Regions:
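Catalytic alpha/beta core domains of metabolic enzymes, predominantly
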Residues: 5-148
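A glycine-rich helix N-cap at a beta->alpha junction
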Residues: 1-2
Length: 151
């Protein structure tokens, strides 16, 4: 996956992806219409739709994630309703959760557990909203996600 292609710099990312056989992460700022528009622009530059992965950007849980969730859900529902411009897999990288104020200001011995909890719940919610790929940083988050997703 090569990324991120954004509205102001998608051509160079698309060219590199095409030249080297990579998929493109199309990142738009938490907006269904902007995600759709970027996918169209990428396809017009020659990137096949099966080589595009949508990243609608994910805020941390409690920091706008509710809106991110809503946008991800609407993208997935539009795709399921037949909108080919949004029928691509989604990626979510809620890694901001490790540095939010609640984690930074927690008692030192609780910071690690709190960081894992915030990252886990945000990542799990992203899966529920329709993300196919979720990027996390903490190894304990990976363990917990594997456990609940394999259940």
């Amino acid at each position: 996956l090569l990324g991120t292609a954004e509205a102001d710099r998608y051509r160079s990312v698309a060219a590199a992806a095409l030249a080297y056989g990579h998929l493109v992460i199309a990142q738009s700022p938490i907006d269904v219409n902007l995600a759709k528009q970027l996918n169209i622009l990428l396809r017009e530059t020659g990137v096949p739709e099966d080589r595009i992965v949508i990243d609608p950007y994910t805020g941390a849980l409690g920091y706008g994630f509710e809106y991110s969730y809503s946008v991800m859900e609407r993208i997935r529902l539009a795709a399921l309703a037949g909108d080919g411009d949004l029928a691509m897999p989604m990626i979510s990288a809620p890694t901001d959760t490790l540095t939010i104020r609640e984690v930074r200001e927690a008692v030192p011995e609780e910071q690690d557990a709190m960081a894992v909890a915030w990252e886990f719940y945000t990542a799990y919610s992203a899966f529920a909203a329709g993300a196919s790929i979720v990027c996390v940083r903490h190894p304990l988050t990976v363990e917990r996600l594997k456990k609940v997703l394999e259940a």
